[in-house]
């Protein structure tokens, strides 16, 4: 069946103003604004209330010493304790730091084992500095090679 191009153009021109179907507005996407985190906190607070946890005020900082020598440091910390259930909760943003970063204020918090580890750490640091100084002395005697430059003229 042949199609008359003039009639087709005329029909397209007439139907250009007619819209088929209704207007659709875009659905607004829901953004996750941390509601899942709030639910977890609410559940945690409810459980602590069941345990009759007591909030401890005026805690400046908390440090958890790890076996690998690093420290979990809580600068601004909230603490709740339920001693009858052997439960303690620490709230805050933890930062993983090296032991050296927290000196000298952390010395009073260290136990006997940590003080031994501290003396070993000091010995390791002294050895590392001695090795660096020895390495620098060796490097001064070795000239740097530059492409296109010869050292024969300097020797004579």
Curated annotation (Swiss-Prot):
Subcellular locations according to the entry: Cytoplasm; Nucleus
GO biological process: cotranslational protein targeting to membrane; mitophagy; protein transport
GO CC entries: nascent polypeptide-associated complex; nucleus
Keyword Protein transport listed: yes
Domain NAC-A/B, residue spans: 38-103
UniProt key word Transcription regulation: yes
Segments of this protein annotated with the region Disordered: 1-42, 129-156
Location (main, coarse): cytoplasm
Pfam assignment, any one: NAC
Family matches, as InterPro entries: BTF3, NAC_A/B_dom_sf, Nas_poly-pep-assoc_cplx_dom
Keyword field: Cytoplasm, Nucleus, Protein transport, Repressor, Transcription, Transcription regulation, Transport
MF terms in GO: unfolded protein binding
Function statement: Component of the nascent polypeptide-associated complex (NAC), a dynamic component of the ribosomal exit tunnel, protecting the emerging polypeptides from interaction with other cytoplasmic proteins to ensure appropriate nascent protein targeting. The NAC complex also promotes mitochondrial protein import by enhancing productive ribosome interactions with the outer mitochondrial membrane and blocks the inappropriate interaction of ribosomes translating non-secretory nascent polypeptides with translocation sites in the membrane of the endoplasmic reticulum.
Assembly, per entry: Part of the nascent polypeptide-associated complex (NAC), consisting of EGD2 and EGD1. NAC associates with ribosomes via EGD1.
Family: Belongs to the NAC-beta family.
Protein's recorded name: Nascent polypeptide-associated complex subunit beta
